[in-house]
C-alpha cells in the first residue's frame, strides 16, 4: 500500500476566506467579535496557520497503470485509514541541567527531564537551567567531582531540602514518665523524632538548651541537616500517659492499689 501525507487545511474555510478578502472584507475579518453574538451559518475565517499533519494510507491498493498512463482511480481508492496524527503525538520531554535549586525538581547539577513548556518558558529564561549538551554535562561532572573532593562548597541535596521544609512546619512532643527522675538527652529526643514524626535524626545533629531539662514544659531543639542547614523545632515535654511496657504498667497498678487500700487506724 502506498502511503500518502495529507494536511488539515479546511478547504471550504480557505475558499470562503479568499472570496471575502477579494471583496475587500479584510477589516471585517480583523474586527474582534463582540461577546454574546451567536455565530451565523458561515464560520469565522481563521488567519492562524494550522501546522497539524495527518498521515493516512489507502485502504485499497491502486493497480499499476500502463507506461505513460495515469492510474485509474475508483471510489474505493479514496478510502483511507489513519496511520498517525502528528497533532496528538505524545510530546517529548526536554533534558536540562539545573544551575540552581528548584523546588520539586532538583538541585544544582541534576540532569532532569521536564516538559518543553516548563523548560522554555520558565527554567531557561530565568537562568535556572541550561541545555544538556555534552559540553555542559562535562562541565557539571567536573564541578561535582570537585565538590566530592572538598574543593568547593557543598550543596544541600534534594532529600535534604525536603527534610528542611518538613521540619520547619513540625512540632515535637516528648513524653516522659513521672515515676523516676529523668533528664532529657539527645538520644531520647532522636527516638521521639522517629516515633512521632517519622524522621531519622542522628543524636550528634541535635542541640538542646544548655540548662538541663528535668521538668515538663515548652522547650526547643535544633536539628542540623547534612551539616548545612540548622532548623529550630519547638518541643513540648509532657507526661507520658500511655504506658506500653509491662514494668511501667505494674508500677501504675501498685500505685493505684496503694491509693485504694484502706488505712488502718493507729492505736
Swiss-Prot record:
Transmembrane segments: none annotated. Residues 1-52 form a transit peptide. GO terms for cellular component: mitochondrial large ribosomal subunit; mitochondrion. It comes from the Eukaryota. InterPro entries: MRP-L9_N, Ribosomal_bL9, Ribosomal_bL9/RNase_H1_N, Ribosomal_bL9_N, Ribosomal_bL9_N_sf, Ribosomal_bL9m_C. Its main location: mitochondrion. The keyword Mitochondrion applies. One of its GO terms (molecular function) is structural constituent of ribosome. Pfam families: bL9m_N (PF25131), Ribosomal_bL9m_C (PF22078), Ribosomal_L9_N (PF01281). Component of the mitochondrial ribosome large subunit (39S) which comprises a 16S rRNA and about 50 distinct proteins. Belongs to the bacterial ribosomal protein bL9 family. This is Large ribosomal subunit protein bL9m. The lineage of its organism: Eukaryota, Metazoa, Chordata, Craniata, Vertebrata.
Amino acid at each position: 500500500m502506498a502511503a500518502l501525507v495529507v494536511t488539515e487545511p479546511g478547504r471550504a474555510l480557505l475558499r470562503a476566506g479568499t472570496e471575502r478578502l477579494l471583496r475587500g472584507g479584510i477589516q471585517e475579518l480583523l474586527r474582534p467579535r463582540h461577546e454574546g453574538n451567536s455565530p451565523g451559518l458561515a464560520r469565522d475565517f481563521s488567519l492562524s496557520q494550522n501546522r497539524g499533519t495527518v498521515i493516512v494510507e489507502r485502504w485499497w491498493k491502486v493497480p499499476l497503470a500502463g507506461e505513460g498512463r495515469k492510474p485509474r482511480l475508483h471510489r474505493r481508492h479514496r478510502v483511507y485509514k489513519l496511520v498517525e496524527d502528528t497533532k496528538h503525538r505524545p510530546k517529548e520531554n526536554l533534558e536540562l541541567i539545573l544551575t540552581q535549586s528548584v523546588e520539586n525538581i532538583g538541585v544544582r547539577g541534576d540532569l532532569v527531564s521536564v516538559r518543553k513548556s516548563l523548560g522554555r518558558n520558565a527554567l531557561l529564561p530565568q537562568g535556572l537551567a541550561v541545555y544538556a549538551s555534552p559540553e555542559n554535562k562535562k562541565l557539571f561532572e567536573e564541578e561535582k567531582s570537585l565538590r566530592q573532593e572538598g574543593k568547593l562548597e557543598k550543596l544541600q541535596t534534594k532529600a535534604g531540602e525536603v527534610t528542611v521544609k518538613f521540619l520547619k512546619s513540625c512540632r515535637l512532643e516528648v513524653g516522659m514518665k513521672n515515676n523516676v527522675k529523668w533528664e532529657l538527652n539527645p538520644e531520647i529526643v532522636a527516638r521521639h523524632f522517629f516515633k512521632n514524626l517519622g524522621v531519622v535524626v542522628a543524636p550528634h545533629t541535635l542541640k538542646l538548651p544548655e540548662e538541663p531539662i528535668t521538668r515538663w514544659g515548652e522547650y526547643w531543639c535544633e536539628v542540623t541537616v547534612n551539616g548545612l542547614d540548622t532548623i529550630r523545632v519547638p518541643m513540648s515535654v509532657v507526661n507520658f500517659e500511655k504506658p506500653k511496657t509491662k514494668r511501667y504498667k505494674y508500677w501504675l497498678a501498685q500505685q493505684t492499689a496503694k491509693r485504694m487500700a484502706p488505712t488502718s487506724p493507729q492505736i
